[in-house]
Curated annotation (Swiss-Prot):
Pfam family membership, one: DCD
Species per Swiss-Prot/TrEMBL record: Teredinibacter turnerae (strain ATCC 39867 / T7901)
NCBIfam families registered for this protein in UniProt: dCTP_deam (TIGR02274)
Protein name: dCTP deaminase
Catalytic activity as recorded in UniProt: dCTP + H2O + H(+) = dUTP + NH4(+)
Gene Ontology annotations of biological process type: dUMP biosynthetic process; dUTP biosynthetic process; nucleobase-containing small molecule interconversion
Gene name tied to this protein: dcd
Description of how the protein assembles with itself and partners: Homotrimer.
Binding site for dCTP: 112-117, 136-138, 157, 171, 181
Length: 189
Protein backbone atom coordinates (compact mmCIF):
# COMPACT_ATOMS: atom_id res chain seq x y z
CA UNK A 1 0.00 0.00 0.00
CA UNK A 2 1.51 3.33 -1.01
CA UNK A 3 0.64 6.95 -0.28
CA UNK A 4 -0.47 8.95 -3.32
CA UNK A 5 1.17 12.18 -4.51
CA UNK A 6 -0.19 15.58 -5.50
CA UNK A 7 0.08 14.55 -9.17
CA UNK A 8 -2.18 11.51 -8.60
CA UNK A 9 -4.63 13.53 -6.46
CA UNK A 10 -4.97 16.20 -9.19
CA UNK A 11 -5.50 13.58 -11.90
CA UNK A 12 -8.14 11.67 -9.91
CA UNK A 13 -9.99 14.84 -8.94
CA UNK A 14 -9.94 16.40 -12.40
CA UNK A 15 -10.58 13.26 -14.47
CA UNK A 16 -12.57 11.03 -12.07
CA UNK A 17 -14.39 13.55 -9.84
CA UNK A 18 -12.76 12.17 -6.67
CA UNK A 19 -12.98 15.57 -4.90
CA UNK A 20 -15.56 18.26 -5.70
CA UNK A 21 -15.04 21.19 -5.50
CA UNK A 22 -11.31 20.73 -6.02
CA UNK A 23 -8.39 23.11 -5.54
CA UNK A 24 -5.25 21.98 -7.45
CA UNK A 25 -2.86 24.11 -5.34
CA UNK A 26 -2.61 25.40 -1.76
CA UNK A 27 -4.78 28.42 -0.95
CA UNK A 28 -3.37 30.54 1.88
CA UNK A 29 -5.12 33.90 1.35
CA UNK A 30 -8.70 34.96 0.65
CA UNK A 31 -9.81 37.38 -2.11
CA UNK A 32 -9.04 40.32 0.24
CA UNK A 33 -5.48 39.03 0.79
CA UNK A 34 -6.32 38.01 4.39
CA UNK A 35 -4.52 34.92 5.76
CA UNK A 36 -6.49 31.67 5.86
CA UNK A 37 -5.88 28.28 7.41
CA UNK A 38 -4.61 26.71 4.17
CA UNK A 39 -6.60 24.27 2.05
CA UNK A 40 -6.19 22.43 -1.26
CA UNK A 41 -3.65 20.00 -2.67
CA UNK A 42 -0.43 19.42 -0.73
CA UNK A 43 2.55 17.19 -1.55
CA UNK A 44 0.93 13.94 -0.38
CA UNK A 45 -2.57 14.89 0.65
CA UNK A 46 -5.53 17.20 0.33
CA UNK A 47 -6.44 19.80 2.97
CA UNK A 48 -10.24 19.94 3.26
CA UNK A 49 -12.42 22.84 4.35
CA UNK A 50 -15.13 22.94 6.95
CA UNK A 51 -18.59 24.02 5.73
CA UNK A 52 -20.80 26.58 7.55
CA UNK A 53 -23.03 23.96 9.15
CA UNK A 54 -22.20 22.92 12.73
CA UNK A 55 -23.76 20.86 15.51
CA UNK A 56 -22.50 21.66 19.01
CA UNK A 57 -23.12 19.41 22.01
CA UNK A 58 -25.37 20.88 24.68
CA UNK A 59 -26.65 19.57 27.99
CA UNK A 60 -29.86 21.62 27.98
CA UNK A 61 -32.02 18.47 27.83
CA UNK A 62 -29.79 16.38 30.15
CA UNK A 63 -29.49 13.74 27.43
CA UNK A 64 -27.17 10.76 27.67
CA UNK A 65 -24.88 10.18 24.69
CA UNK A 66 -25.79 6.72 23.42
CA UNK A 67 -24.53 5.74 19.95
CA UNK A 68 -27.27 3.06 19.66
CA UNK A 69 -30.07 5.44 20.60
CA UNK A 70 -28.79 8.89 19.72
CA UNK A 71 -30.87 11.89 20.80
CA UNK A 72 -30.75 14.73 18.25
CA UNK A 73 -31.56 17.14 21.08
CA UNK A 74 -27.98 16.63 22.28
CA UNK A 75 -26.92 19.25 19.72
CA UNK A 76 -27.57 22.89 18.90
CA UNK A 77 -27.51 23.62 15.14
CA UNK A 78 -25.51 26.63 13.97
CA UNK A 79 -24.91 28.04 10.49
CA UNK A 80 -22.04 30.53 10.58
CA UNK A 81 -18.59 31.47 9.28
CA UNK A 82 -17.20 30.56 12.71
CA UNK A 83 -18.10 28.04 15.37
CA UNK A 84 -17.23 28.53 19.02
CA UNK A 85 -16.82 25.17 20.75
CA UNK A 86 -17.32 25.42 24.53
CA UNK A 87 -14.47 24.33 26.84
CA UNK A 88 -13.97 20.55 27.03
CA UNK A 89 -16.80 20.06 24.54
CA UNK A 90 -17.45 18.58 21.13
CA UNK A 91 -18.90 19.64 17.77
CA UNK A 92 -19.72 18.11 14.41
CA UNK A 93 -19.40 19.70 10.98
CA UNK A 94 -18.92 18.54 7.41
CA UNK A 95 -16.47 19.15 4.61
CA UNK A 96 -17.17 21.58 1.79
CA UNK A 97 -15.79 18.88 -0.49
CA UNK A 98 -17.72 15.82 -1.68
CA UNK A 99 -15.56 12.68 -2.03
CA UNK A 100 -15.77 9.63 -4.31
CA UNK A 101 -13.15 7.15 -3.13
CA UNK A 102 -11.81 4.69 -5.76
CA UNK A 103 -12.19 0.95 -5.11
CA UNK A 104 -8.44 0.45 -4.63
CA UNK A 105 -8.00 3.37 -2.19
CA UNK A 106 -8.36 3.89 1.57
CA UNK A 107 -8.34 7.51 2.79
CA UNK A 108 -7.18 8.55 6.25
CA UNK A 109 -7.84 11.97 7.77
CA UNK A 110 -5.49 13.80 10.13
CA UNK A 111 -5.92 17.14 11.86
CA UNK A 112 -4.00 20.24 10.80
CA UNK A 113 -1.22 21.40 13.11
CA UNK A 114 -2.71 24.93 13.28
CA UNK A 115 -5.71 23.55 15.18
CA UNK A 116 -3.89 20.75 17.03
CA UNK A 117 -1.51 23.29 18.58
CA UNK A 118 -4.56 25.10 19.96
CA UNK A 119 -5.94 21.96 21.62
CA UNK A 120 -8.55 21.32 18.92
CA UNK A 121 -8.54 17.70 17.82
CA UNK A 122 -10.16 16.57 14.55
CA UNK A 123 -11.30 12.96 14.31
CA UNK A 124 -12.61 11.27 11.17
CA UNK A 125 -12.83 7.54 10.59
CA UNK A 126 -11.24 6.23 7.35
CA UNK A 127 -13.00 6.79 4.03
CA UNK A 128 -13.35 3.26 2.73
CA UNK A 129 -13.07 2.01 -0.87
CA UNK A 130 -16.03 3.23 -2.99
CA UNK A 131 -17.47 5.37 -0.19
CA UNK A 132 -18.83 8.71 -1.33
CA UNK A 133 -20.29 11.76 0.36
CA UNK A 134 -19.50 14.82 2.42
CA UNK A 135 -17.21 13.88 5.30
CA UNK A 136 -18.65 14.43 8.77
CA UNK A 137 -15.94 16.01 10.91
CA UNK A 138 -15.70 15.54 14.68
CA UNK A 139 -14.00 18.24 16.76
CA UNK A 140 -12.93 18.00 20.39
CA UNK A 141 -11.98 21.14 22.28
CA UNK A 142 -9.55 19.75 24.84
CA UNK A 143 -8.88 23.13 26.44
CA UNK A 144 -10.56 24.87 29.42
CA UNK A 145 -11.29 27.82 27.08
CA UNK A 146 -13.76 28.35 24.21
CA UNK A 147 -12.21 27.42 20.84
CA UNK A 148 -12.95 28.85 17.39
CA UNK A 149 -13.30 26.86 14.14
CA UNK A 150 -13.38 28.74 10.81
CA UNK A 151 -15.74 27.71 8.01
CA UNK A 152 -14.45 27.66 4.42
CA UNK A 153 -10.86 27.32 5.59
CA UNK A 154 -8.57 24.32 5.99
CA UNK A 155 -9.44 22.00 8.88
CA UNK A 156 -7.90 18.57 8.19
CA UNK A 157 -5.74 16.68 5.70
CA UNK A 158 -6.82 13.62 3.72
CA UNK A 159 -4.13 11.07 2.85
CA UNK A 160 -4.82 8.57 0.06
CA UNK A 161 -3.38 5.05 0.19
CA UNK A 162 -3.68 2.73 -2.80
CA UNK A 163 -3.60 -1.01 -2.23
CA UNK A 164 -1.58 -3.46 -4.30
CA UNK A 165 -4.74 -5.53 -4.60
CA UNK A 166 -8.40 -4.56 -5.14
CA UNK A 167 -10.67 -5.47 -2.22
CA UNK A 168 -13.31 -8.19 -2.66
CA UNK A 169 -16.02 -6.12 -0.97
CA UNK A 170 -16.15 -2.32 -0.98
CA UNK A 171 -18.16 0.03 1.24
CA UNK A 172 -20.67 0.42 -1.59
CA UNK A 173 -20.93 -3.37 -2.05
CA UNK A 174 -21.78 -3.72 1.68
CA UNK A 175 -24.47 -1.05 1.43
CA UNK A 176 -22.68 1.08 4.04
CA UNK A 177 -25.04 3.19 6.16
CA UNK A 178 -23.18 6.46 5.51
CA UNK A 179 -22.97 6.01 1.73
CA UNK A 180 -23.89 9.21 -0.15
CA UNK A 181 -24.26 11.30 3.01
CA UNK A 182 -24.75 15.03 2.64
CA UNK A 183 -24.81 17.51 5.47
CA UNK A 184 -23.68 16.76 9.01
CA UNK A 185 -24.69 13.13 9.60
CA UNK A 186 -25.46 11.89 13.11
CA UNK A 187 -24.63 8.35 14.34
CA UNK A 188 -26.58 5.44 12.82
CA UNK A 189 -26.75 1.80 13.88
Amino acid sequence: MSIKSDKWIRRMAEQEGMIEPFEPGQIRYDSNNQKLVSYGTSSYGYDVRCAREFKIFTNVHSAVVDPKNFDEHSFVDISSDVCIIPPNSFALARTVEYFRIPRSVLTVCLGKSTYARCGIIVNVTPLEPEWEGHVTLEFSNTTPLPAKIYANEGIAQMLFFESDEICDTSYRDRGGKYQGQTGVTLPKT
